[in-house]
Structure formats: C-alpha cells, structure tokens
Regions:
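Conserved N-terminal phosphate-binding loop of PLP-dependent enzymes in the Aspartate aminotransferase
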Residues: 1-424
Length: 424
C-alpha cells in the first residue's frame, strides 16, 4: 500500500475552495472508492505524486500524451514560444503552420479553426452545421460524449430516439429540444429515424470509436451507415475525433476506417499538452463562419502561440516513418496477452489501436446499455489494487486507457503481471 498522506491533505485543502476539490469530476476518484493523488511531476510513462510515489500512467491526461509526458522536444518548443509571448489576440504564423499540419493529416478538414477545448470544437461545429443547412435537429448517440455544452448533455433512456431528456441538472428543457439520441451500433434505429425525419436533421455527430462509455468500437456496417444516411438527406456528418484524432492513426479514425465526414473535431493530442482543439471540414461549409459568413464564433486565447508550437512539434514527431506501426505492434502484443489473462474471468477487453477498456462484464459490450451492466464495484477494487502496485489506470469503468510510445515492452510486461494479480 502506497502512502498518500500529502495527497489526502492537499485534497482536504482543495475542497475548501474548489467544488468537490477537483476541476473535473472524475479526478476525485469517488467512483473507485479512494481519494485523488496530487501530481508533482511527470516524465515519459510515469507520474510522481507529492508523496514521492511513482506510477506508470495509463490515462496519459486522457490520451493527450501519445509521445509520453514532458517530451523534451515538445517542452522546448513550448518554452521557446513563451519566451516571445504567450498570447496576443492577434494572428501569428504558428496558427497557420499548425493548421497546415492538421490538414496534411486530415484532408477532409479543407478549412479549420482553432479553439481551446473539445467542448468548444464540437459546439462550434454544430453551430456551423446548423447555419449551413438551415436546419435545427442534431442527432447523437447514447453514451457518446461530445463535451459539456448544454445541448449535448442528453442521453436516451431506452433503445429509441428521445427528445428533451437532459442528463445534467441545470440544463433547461428548451436547450435540448432539438437534440435526438439514438442507440449506438443500431443500424435499424438509425435508418428508421432518418427515413422519417432525415430532411429536418442539420447534423449527425459521432465518436467514430466511442471512448467515453469506455472504448466501444462501431461495427463496420454501422459507421458506414452514418455516412450513407447523412448523404441521402443532406445532413452534415461530424466525426468527433477529439480523442481518436492522431491517436488511431496520423489521420485518425476516418483514415483507419476509410470514411470521409463533412466536418471533424480534433483535440487533446493536437495541442501537445496545452489547451487547444480544432474544428473544420469542407470549404463550402466552413465559409459560413464570420468574418466571411453569418455564423459567429470567437475566442480570446484561441490559437495561442504556446499551444500551437507544442502541437506542431507533437505532430511533427508523430509524422515520422514507423511511429504508428511501432505503437500498433506494441499495443497488439500487450492486448493479445491481456485477453488471454482475463479469459473466463468475466472481463471483456474492448480495444482499437492504442486505446482499450477492461469491462468487468460477462457479456460482450457493444453499446451504452451493455456498458451499464458492468460491475463497477469490482472495477473499483481492481483500480485500487493497481494503484497499490504503482499503476494509474483511468479511474472509471467507463473510460479508456492509452498506450504511448514511452510504454516499453518491459513496462507493459509488468503491467500485465499486475493486472493478473489485481483482478478477482
């Protein structure tokens, strides 16, 4: 058992001024029956807390650090940039050079704009889609998270489309009246809704691989159907690649699946560890944005030069030959061995590329309703057991874990041994 007295004291101090003691709910570790560790430093695959404990990190700031924490070249790029100024509210060349780098890897983003978070990116993309189509209805899928904008905090309570069912207090009914939620991986429900209402739909937004109910891959037929029905009815297909962008390949999930959306959002990796995200798409769609068009969007710190520099250096390294092949090879080796370890033990390993979730569930997990059948108490015990062994896995049954270039085979071997000891 690792001592975390300093972290416990820091948490009590934080709770006196920050609601719940944290700036994002999952960080409180409430669902896994413990209190948060407070981080002092991070390097490569490791994080170090204020009690001088060292942990192998499998959250990697929720997938941001695909190169590992505190990459030397990325840190230097950021420090060099900040020497010249951290924000100007005036254009810089750094914005254009990173935008060109993003478009190089995501050709579907013919025009793009930077914002500060994934929530801003999805919120802005939806506004653009509505402005372009002149329609109101947004279709999303149960269990897919697209940020905490009011009209996106909606989920269905059954395997049918529902309107106006907010999943957070403080969201007025009127904010969600144009959001429709369909069951994930259900082609029949998707086709039925579009057959009856498709001409009213402004956009369909989807995580091309669901990551925020745990990693739940789409069936090939389902993800292809999202492209088919939107094209048939003139609706905008938005791929929310805030997590999968630059994670599943240099061109994200859309390159991996060979499907071209009308609009895309990227985040996390694109800022190299700094607050940054982007939304973009076809040039004709993006032309409705002010100052060229009537759709307004703005941000004081959008495209700040420090994030742009860190993002550019990150993408530069990811674009080097063999990077994704190495990531895939290392991940496949780890995950194939993990599947053998958990076989017959009531655990499902869902994975795509370097992302995976261990569902403590007897049955395959294909949608949000399946995820809710998972044993959260068993997961919580597993999380605490892993923490005691010096491994920080993502602290929720309904989140993904992420492998980075810094997770060597030796480290992954130790993680496998620890998993075998930690599951019940």
């Amino acid at each position: 058992m690792k001592e975390r007295k300093n972290s416990a004291a820091a948490f009590e101090q934080a709770k006196q001024i920050i609601p719940g003691g944290v700036n994002s709910p999952v960080r409180a570790l409430k669902s896994v029956g413990t209190t948060p560790l407070f981080v002092r430093d991070a390097k490569g695959p490791y994080i170090y807390d204020i009690d001088d404990n060292k942990f192998i990190d499998f959250s990697m700031s929720w997938g941001v650090f695909i190169l590992g924490h505190n990459n030397d070249k990325v840190s230097k790029a950021a420090s060099d940039a900040i020497f010249h100024g951290s924000s100007f509210g005036i254009p810089t060349l750094a914005e254009t050079t990173l935008a060109e780098k993003v478009r190089e890897s995501f050709p579907s983003m013919e025009r793009l704009r930077f914002v500060n978070s994934g929530t801003e990116a999805t919120m802005s993309a939806i506004r653009v889609a509505r402005g372009f189509t002149g329609r109101d209805i947004l279709v999303k899928f149960e269990g897919c998270y697209h940020g905490h904008a009011d009209h996106l905090l909606v989920s269905a309570g059954s395997a049918v489309a529902k309107l106006n069912n907010a999943s957070s207090a403080g969201v007025p009914a009127g904010f969600t009246q144009y959001t429709v939620v369909l069951p994930y991986n259900d082609i029949e429900a998707l086709e039925k809704y579009f057959a009856e209402n498709g001409d009213k739909v402004a956009a369909l937004i989807i995580e091309p691989v669901a990551c925020n109910m745990g990693v739940v891959p789409p069936t090939r037929e389902f993800i292809e159907a999202t492209r088919k029905v939107t094209q048939e009815h003139g609706a905008i297909l938005i791929f929310d690649e805030v997590i999968t962008g630059f994670r599943l390949s240099y061109g994200g999930a859309q390159k991996r699946f060979g499907i071209t959306p009308d609009m895309t959002t990227v985040g996390k990796i694109v800022g190299g560890g700094f607050p940054a995200a982007a939304f973009g798409g076809r040039a004709d769609i993006m032309s409705v944005l002010a100052p060229e068009g009537p759709v307004y969007q703005a941000g004081t710190l959008s495209g700040n030069p420090v994030a742009m520099a860190a993002g550019y250096e990150t993408l530069k390294q990811l674009g080097e030959p063999g990077v994704y092949e190495l990531l895939e090879e290392r991940s496949n080796r780890f995950l194939s061995r993990l599947e053998k370890i958990v076989e017959g033990k009531g655990i499902q390993v869902n994975h795509v590329g370097t992302m995976f979730t261990m569902f403590f569930n007897d049955q395959p997990v294909r949608n949000f309703q399946d995820t809710k059948k998972s044993d959260q108490e068993r997961f919580a015990r597993y999380f605490r057991n892993m923490l005691d062994r010096g491994i920080y896995v993502s602290p929720s049954q309904f989140e993904g874990n992420f492998i980075s270039l810094c997770h060597t085979d030796e480290i992954l071997d130790y993680v496998l041994k620890s998993i075998e000891e930690s599951i019940e």
